């Protein structure tokens, strides 16, 4: 389960060289902030660390060094504070798309590639990404040619995540509390004093 190709020069994970040794390769689609392994969090830590080690560098300088190391520029990110504002549509369209495409091309066989998707939480300690970001990741990855993914919720799926994923993978979930209900979201009668929802649908 390697990190996305942007980290390959620094982690020594060569997609082309590892492809013959594995039946499947699961590129980590980890883009959250804070915690560990997430792209935003990693870039933030490196910018902060470079600034601490080199007090004469401005934040702009530190971002420029990290961008040079990784060969990537985050759309809409000019400062550490910008990382707190979440991911732009352009981030998904450019960064997620390009990283997925690079993994697919490096491995050379889309049937061997399964995107390992997570949106923060435990065990990584990252800021939870909203369902719209999950949708952005999945849509951009699919547009780049990814055929399969594995979603790693921690600890449980929420209703919005399940609805988004089911809409991409066959039959859209029927959000009916009397049927399947994701454990990561309380049923409607759990937060209204136990009153049953009216039979309107």
Which residues does each PLM region occupy?
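Glycan-processing catalytic domains of CAZymes
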Residues: 1-201
């Amino acid at each position: 389960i390697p990190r996305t190709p942007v980290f390959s020069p620094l982690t020594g994970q060569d997609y082309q060289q590892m492809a013959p040794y594995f039946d499947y390769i699961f590129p980590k689609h980890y883009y959250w902030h804070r915690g560990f392994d997430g792209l935003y969090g990693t870039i933030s830590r490196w910018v902060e660390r470079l600034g601490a080690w080199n007090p004469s560098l401005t934040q702009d300088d530190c971002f420029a060094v990290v961008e040079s190391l990784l060969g990537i520029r985050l759309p809409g990110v000019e400062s550490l504070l910008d990382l707190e504002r979440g991911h732009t549509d352009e981030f998904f369209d450019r960064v997620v798309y390009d990283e997925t495409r690079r993994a697919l091309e490096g491995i050379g066989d889309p049937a061997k590639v399964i995107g390992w998707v997570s949106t923060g939480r435990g065990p990584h300690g990252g800021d939870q990404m909203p369902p719209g970001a999950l949708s952005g990741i999945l849509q951009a990855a699919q547009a780049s040619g990814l055929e399969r993914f594995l979603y790693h919720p921690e600890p449980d799926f929420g209703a919005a995540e399940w609805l988004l994923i089911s809409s991409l993978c066959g039959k859209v979930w029927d959000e009916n509390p009397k049927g399947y209900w994701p454990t990561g979201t309380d049923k409607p009668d759990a937060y209204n004093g136990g009153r049953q929802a009216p039979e309107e649908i």
